Amino acid sequence: MFVDIHTSSKQYKAEVGSGILREAGKTIEALAPASSYLIVSDENVANRYLDVLVSSFSKEPHTFVVKAGEQSKSFHVYEQLAAFCLEKQLDRQSVIIAFGGGVVGDLAGFVAGTYMRGVRFIQVPTTLLAHDSSVGGKVAVNLPAAKNMIGVFHQPEAVLFDTELLATLPEHEWRSGFAEIVKLGFIADASFLAWLRETVPALTSIKADNLQKMVAKAIAIKADIVGKDEKEHGIRAHLNFGHTLAHAIEAELGYGKITHGEAVAIGMRFAFRLSLRFTKEDLRLADYEEWFSALGYDLRLPAGLSAQRLLARMKSDKKTNAGKIVMVLLAQLGAAYTKTVDEHLLLELLEEELGGRS
């Protein structure tokens, strides 16, 4: 399956299919001829699949492997990778290939966007979550106190998504990626949301053809939003539904202590509750709480967190305007909007959530 992605800066395709990794090198060489190729991966992916990707090239590419986990989205690792590019004499005709999950995609993409003021790169995601981060051109590294704060917009030349690679993912990584897929239904496509509820009663029961349809549709929805607002001046902010609180949770717990998507699921439930303060629409929150619980999500705020500290973290969100927290809310299922929300209301709801843990 192919999805066309059109932005103001670039047009490219995302290919979603089973077994495409085995021919990925030839595909990349035909699509983006280069003076040299560099594959960036993490230890987990490299141990399983790096040889398959390397052997698919006609000429052996350079490889750079980082530790798995959010700690690799740092300035220290960024500098190491940029120095490696210089050592291996990558030039402006080179192509960097991000082969991994969202961390690798962000790191490799940020280096590609800044090395020599920008070289081409290709996304080869290996997690369900990375269906989201691999499309749209947002690439960044973290600051110790805030996620994705230092970055650029740098669109890839292509996205190659081999769904066979998802077979080895642990269940918590399925939950992480699936939350971002459901998010797209919540904010932009109620019919897709209904199809997901009907098709996925359990994450272990997704058929191969439905998995490809699900990923391709999610990419298409995001591509449509990004095509209308590449640099996030308007509706692209809707993709941050659930993320204002999610990023605060991740920072408070320490990056890597909870998966991004599981934090987003908690953040979406909070945003649902907040949305109900401003709409008379029936958002069917209880139905979605029941479905997510059946899928194995814990939608409660993690124990031991402080409402005041979470609120302070939320003020570091990129949507914040003049110190005011801007939240993505639902007008109805399939339709989102942004709203500046009084911090006293946010604090009240956070304290309710933390006080309601049992």
Swiss-Prot record:
Q: How is the cofactor bound?
A: Binds 1 divalent metal cation per subunit. Can use either Co(2+) or Zn(2+).
Residues annotated to bind Zn(2+): E180, H243, H260
Recite the UniProt keywords alphabetically: Amino-acid biosynthesis, Aromatic amino acid biosynthesis, Cobalt, Cytoplasm, Lyase, Metal-binding, NAD, Nucleotide-binding, Zinc
Nucleotide-binding is among the record's keywords: yes
**Pfam families noted in UniProt:** DHQ_synthase, DHQS_C
Which leading EC class covers this enzyme? lyase
**Disulfide bond sites:** none
- Which Gene Ontology terms cover its molecular function? 3-dehydroquinate synthase activity; metal ion binding; nucleotide binding
Give the required cofactors: Co(2+); Zn(2+); NAD(+)
Tell me yes or no: is Transcription among this UniProt entry's keywords: no
Which E.C. number(s) belong to this protein?
4.2.3.4
Function, as annotated, reads: Catalyzes the conversion of 3-deoxy-D-arabino-heptulosonate 7-phosphate (DAHP) to dehydroquinate (DHQ).
From the Swiss-Prot or TrEMBL record, give the protein name: 3-dehydroquinate synthase
Q: Which organism is it from?
A: Shouchella clausii (strain KSM-K16) (Alkalihalobacillus clausii)
Q: What is the lineage of its organism?
A: Bacteria, Bacillati, Bacillota, Bacilli, Bacillales
